[in-house]
């Protein structure tokens, strides 16, 4: 098994910590909030308010299940438009009250079903991209598993984007890439090598800002490392003038 194939396998492993695991272990007094106030509450996106040390923050994540029943309830971590609208509602609330936003991302992509399209999946993702680019509080996004397509990017227009060591971040799945390029989804590993989807490759290209080393899926070291980096980075981001913060975020994505 090549290194890329191993990382792809580990990124998708059902045993990985979920967004709710990180929310409960890194933050204090996490309180989950529900619903987009327009259509429904999407279980594939979770979010709420919490404390990071003594700092109030908004935490949002894409939640995969740990077993079949849980995955069905979470739609296998593939958000509907109401999930993205819930996330945006929480981000705008964070902006109103001056709370930094931290997102945890693990998705193969946004749900492509007919109902999702009819309810405006593309519009929901596009609006998140637009609103996050100008959100007037610090944003940090962390890839904790798969970072697939616009479904991941809709929570990743951030001042800092981090990845765990054995995760992936790509414009589409390697299987989708192989199917489009070669009409053969079985060549996914070959596609992944061409796509440059690993944390090390993306860090080298400047797409992400930090790699979090992994020592097993459930590691107190990972949790403490993320918590420490979050405290330090949010302190630095909050110290910047708002105009500088927003300009740097804009320029960060313009260079792609």
Curated annotation (Swiss-Prot):
It is found in: Cytoplasm. Residues 1-236 form the CoA carboxyltransferase C-terminal domain. GO terms for biological process: fatty acid biosynthetic process; malonyl-CoA biosynthetic process. Transmembrane segments: none annotated. Gene3D superfamilies: 2-enoyl-CoA Hydratase, Chain A, domain 1. Coiled coil: none annotated. Pathway: Lipid metabolism; malonyl-CoA biosynthesis; malonyl-CoA from acetyl-CoA: step 1/1. Its EC number is 2.1.3.15. It catalyses: N(6)-carboxybiotinyl-L-lysyl-[protein] + acetyl-CoA = N(6)-biotinyl-L-lysyl-[protein] + malonyl-CoA. One of its GO terms (molecular function) is carboxyl- or carbamoyltransferase activity. It comes from the Bacteria. Pfam families: ACCA. SUPFAM superfamilies: ClpP/crotonase. Its main location: cytoplasm. InterPro entries: Acetyl_CoA_COase_a_su (IPR001095), ClpP/crotonase-like_dom_sf (IPR029045), COA_CT_C (IPR011763). Component of the acetyl coenzyme A carboxylase (ACC) complex. First, biotin carboxylase catalyzes the carboxylation of biotin on its carrier protein (BCCP) and then the CO(2) group is transferred by the carboxyltransferase to acetyl-CoA to form malonyl-CoA. NCBIfam families: accA, AccA_sub, PRK05724.1, PRK12319.1. Acetyl-CoA carboxylase is a heterohexamer composed of biotin carboxyl carrier protein (AccB), biotin carboxylase (AccC) and two subunits each of ACCase subunit alpha (AccA) and ACCase subunit beta (AccD). This is Acetyl-coenzyme A carboxylase carboxyl transferase subunit alpha. The lineage of its organism: Bacteria, Bacillati, Bacillota, Bacilli, Lactobacillales.
